[in-house]
Amino acid sequence: MYDRWFSQQELQVLPFADEDEQRNQTWLELVGEAQQLMANAARQMSRGRLRWQPAGWSSWSRIHRHAEFLTRLNEMHAAEPQMREQTGVTPEMIDFITRAFAESKLAIWARYLNAEELAFTRQHYFDRLMEWPALVADLHRACREKRDRPPRKVSSWRSAAWRCSSLTRVKMRRRSRISLCHAQVPALMKGTWMTSEVLSWLQQAIGVMMRQAQGPRE
């Protein structure tokens, strides 16, 4: 099944392409945990405990370096009934886990932003949440291919970069707190596939695009 979606080279770094009894048991436990959280969603949400960050699951560490794998796995899960039966993961569970992950990040933002700023961040966070896996995979590829400067003639990349910038399109007085939050809480980057290298490159790229949009100075 996996060989229809991944090359032989990619399968070598995909941790669950081959059968492994211990890993399968770990997966069943993770799915069971998610099912319990779903059953107690309101109570868990109010306590800020909803999260899906299998950082302790060592077999996932290799996927964390391949953001594009997640997009393909999502497509595979939607298209392959066999995979859904094998994993026990339903579309409702995927939505729940995704939002739980987002809530864990918003709980951190709440310590740094005021109520208005947090509401703005929450609105756009969920607006763009499902776009993130494909977007960050595109950004990784663009960063690898154009390290010295951002690609200027690729419309799809421009669109992706502007969508990403909408997540942080806030007033200047908020940006310092957002930067402080990222600096003081590395956990914000955990599980996002966004590395410091790609983030730095993206900030420079968006800066170039904004200057180009403003036109030459007289």
UniProtKB/Swiss-Prot annotation:
Compartment(s): Periplasm
Origin superkingdom: Bacteria
GO cellular component: periplasmic space
Keywords: Antibiotic resistance, Periplasm
Main location (coarse class): periplasm
One GO-annotated biological process of the protein: response to antibiotic
Protein role: Albicidin resistance protein binds to form a complex without antibiotic activity but without catalyzing any further chemical modifications to albicidin.
Name this polypeptide is given: Albicidin resistance protein
Organism name: Klebsiella oxytoca
